[in-house]
């Protein structure tokens, strides 16, 4: 179930982006569209997850990544990967004020997942702009 909050975008459009993304890849465990201020716009986060906390953490991670790429003259941030023992987070900008955060399985084929997440981020950006 996807939740849309604080957005003027009708929920079915954003829900479809997240639904389609997870349908394309069994390696994507969850997905969320999060505004740069940390507000969760749409997500497949389980009910036991603290959406506010996840949003705040994701916004901080993206801000740090953007700052690091700028300071190190790497250009505009395109994606961030945070690796964990049991899975990875892949974060991509989905417009100037939104990011697509995905949790992916540890043994996922990253080439395919990155392409799918990139397409979904572009579609979300198109819908949000």
Q: Residue locations for each model-derived region?
A:
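Non-catalytic interaction/Regulatory regions outside core domains
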Residues: 1-129
């Amino acid at each position: 179930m996807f939740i849309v909050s604080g957005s003027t975008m009708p929920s079915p459009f954003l829900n479809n982006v997240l639904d389609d993304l997870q349908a394309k890849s069994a390696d994507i465990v969850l997905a969320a569209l999060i505004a740069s201020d940390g507000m969760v716009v749409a997500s497949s986060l389980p009910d036991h997850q603290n959406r506010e906390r996840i949003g705040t953490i994701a916004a901080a991670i993206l801000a740090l990544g953007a700052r690091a790429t700028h300071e190190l003259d790497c250009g505009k941030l395109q994606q961030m990967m945070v690796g964990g023992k049991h899975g990875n987070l892949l974060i991509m900008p989905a417009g100037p004020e939104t990011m697509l955060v995905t949790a992916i399985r540890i043994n996922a084929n990253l080439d395919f997942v990155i392409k799918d997440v990139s397409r979904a981020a572009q579609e979300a950006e198109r819908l949000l702009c």
